[in-house]
Swiss-Prot record:
Segments of this protein annotated with the region PPE: 8-164
Protein name: PPE family protein PPE2
Domain of life: Bacteria
The entry's keywords: Host cytoplasm, Host nucleus, Secreted, Virulence
Alphabetized InterPro entries for the sequence: PPE-PPW_C, PPE_dom, PPE_sf
Main function: Inhibits nitric oxide (NO) production in activated macrophages. Acts by inhibiting expression of the host inducible nitric oxide synthase (iNOS). PPE2 is translocated into the host macrophage nucleus, where it interacts with a GATA-binding site overlapping with the TATA box of NOS2 (iNOS) promoter, and strongly inhibits NOS2 gene transcription. Reduction in NO production in turn facilitates intracellular survival of the bacilli inside the macrophage.
Gene3D superfamilies with a match to the protein in the record: PPE superfamily
Lineage: Bacteria, Bacillati, Actinomycetota, Actinomycetes, Mycobacteriales
Recorded name of the encoding gene: PPE2
Region of interest (SH3-like), residue spans: 201-256
One protein family per Pfam: PPE-PPW
One Gene Ontology term from the biological process aspect of the record: response to host immune response
Location within or outside the cell: Secreted; Host cytoplasm; Host nucleus
SUPFAM superfamilies in UniProt: PE/PPE dimer-like (SSF140459)
UniProt region (Disordered), positions on chain: 385-418, 443-556
Amino acid sequence: MTAPIWMASPPEVHSALLSSGPGPGPLLVSAEGWHSLSIAYAETADELAALLAAVQAGTWDGPTAAVYVAAHTPYLAWLVQASANSAAMATRQETAATAYGTALAAMPTLAELGANHALHGVLMATNFFGINTIPIALNESDYARMWIQAATTMASYQAVSTAAVAAAPQTTPAPQIVKANAPTAASDEPNQVQEWLQWLQKIGYTDFYNNVIQPFINWLTNLPFLQAMFSGFDPWLPSLGNPLTFLSPANIAFALGYPMDIGSYVAFLSQTFAFIGADLAAAFASGNPATIAFTLMFTTVEAIGTIITDTIALVKTLLEQTLALLPAALPLLAAPLAPLTLAPASAAGGFAGLSGLAGLVGIPPSAPPVIPPVAAIAPSIPTPTPTPAPAPAPTAVTAPTPPLGPPPPPVTAPPPVTGAGIQSFGYLVGDLNSAAQARKAVGTGVRKKTPEPDSAEAPASAAAPEEQVQPQRRRRPKIKQLGRGYEYLDLDPETGHDPTGSPQGAGTLGFAGTTHKASPGQVAGLITLPNDAFGGSPRTPMMPGTWDTDSATRVE
């Protein structure tokens, strides 16, 4: 920048920009870093110089020692120069930081500028009959002085800082430590593009293209009509838009020999479409319909040819990588199948046995097997030992089945389910023991009247009681065991109250002046048992035919 530019801005702008910046702190920190780097370079150079001096002094004799010293000499010189450059860079940055501090000290502050504006306003407000003309002129001249001072300060700061940055030395890359006459290492990887070019030249395709196709392309490209049309933005567009151009040996060698990866594929296509977009924009900007039409045609051919060439290179590279990875991937793919190939003979026989199921296709289905009667589950309430049942077991008649195989295993009865009997819930229904004794007496009387079975069915009927006696004998002691309800339950004594008519409900009905009469008769209405808890409940359900009419109270 020049002084007039700084002079064109008011001092408030320069003061605000200079005072609101980061200050000289970052420059001083950077200068300290360059000083440290210079010291590190110097220490490394001293160490290497001492090592080379020891080699020359006789630690390592022979011609190889001289070669070793000669190989390290350029690197030693670079270390010394890098140390000097780093020190110079630190000095330049310190100079720029000092210039910044000087400019900040010489720049009028925002407070001074604000005070000048405030004083100018007061003088203008109190300037009656021009009495403040001289103070106003002095204040304005002071503001002009600050304006010039700010511009001069910025110009000086720019000159010093620019010179410091421009004079900063640049360090070159470190030289390699190699033998002076060492041959250049040849690349181990062959150039496939060059190999394809040599093959195309060997078969004569290169000569045919150079002698026949390329002259024709050049003639089309150099047509005055096309040259005048595209000379303004892309004179090579007629050549790139010619499909014969993509048949050149260089393009074929690129498609078949360049190792294309996904990133390069995307980068090449992006670059091509960027060029095509620029050509289309220039053609539409010209406004010439012929230019737009030819540009669309040529760019379409260029896009198709580039996509085909790059896609061939990408597919070829992916196929080569896949074939190279197959030897390493086959063991990984075969690892899950190894247990099947190394399975023991027993496992193989198990799989081979499944083949016998194929012979069952032609065998007719057999009759369903007859399931023998399942033994009834024993009741959980303890009962006395029953007498033999008179009824013989029914004989199941089954249809004959062909001898196709071993008979199915017999179905065995499930084991009797044992659990807490109803006596454990005596607190819900009272006098369970008496009810059990009554049922025992009734059951015994009924079974005593059963006629004896015939002699032919006697063994079968005699075996039935034995099967029922054992569960009952095992369940009988459970009544007296712990956790059976009677251990911690106190039953209320039987009061023996007779059931009476309920005083609740509709109340006394009839004519006025009638009285309540309780007379024996047929039970009707609502019947309750007064003062009844659990102990005085009926032992058997009351049915209409067994109601006790004497103990009921009729509500009339």
